[in-house]
Amino acid sequence: DVKGAAGTWLRAYANDGSMSPDAKRSNFGDVGSQDYSLSSSGIEAGFGYSFNSAWTVGVFGGINQGDYKPDVGGKVSLDGNTWGGYVTFTPGNGFYADLSYRDIGFDGDALNNGSKEQLDGDASGFSLEMGYGFKMQSGLEIEPQLQYSAVSVDLDNVAYTSGGFELTDGDAAQLRIGSAFRKTFNQDNGVWVPYGAVSYIQNYD
């Protein structure tokens, strides 16, 4: 059994994607693209402590960067600092549950029609994920997963060359249902574990 074990970890990540909102414009008509692309990257480091083989708690911090670019022009670039904590439950029967919280302070620039405005704000949110993994006779491990996450964004007011405006704070939630797949290969020089996942994601605001 694991009792009183501690450790550190480090991870780097990068994401890139695009969206095509199902929306209409009330003031300019519904012509023209409303599609946009998103990208983000960052690095995080953390410290975890296992009370026993089932319960682990930890804290983490890191830096991140993101870009938002509409097809019709303009761009928003953000830099942020993040911190948070997590609790993980793994009883050893294939089930796991993970609850995490994070807070992000960010600032950046918005480019639009030749002007450059500064943005500043904070975001906080939590994620609850659980799953159950089982192994096939071939050695393939299949792990159905369920995850719910929510975030709240607090944006400071923006002043620009033609006046000023107040930004509405945003709240959003996401439900993810999916399954992970992995298989362990023991080699002379170590262990290789190829991993993949498929998910259905529903966003709420």
What is the predicted function of each stretch?
Residues 3-205:
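Membrane translocator/pore-forming domains, dominated by Gram-negative outer-membrane beta-barrels
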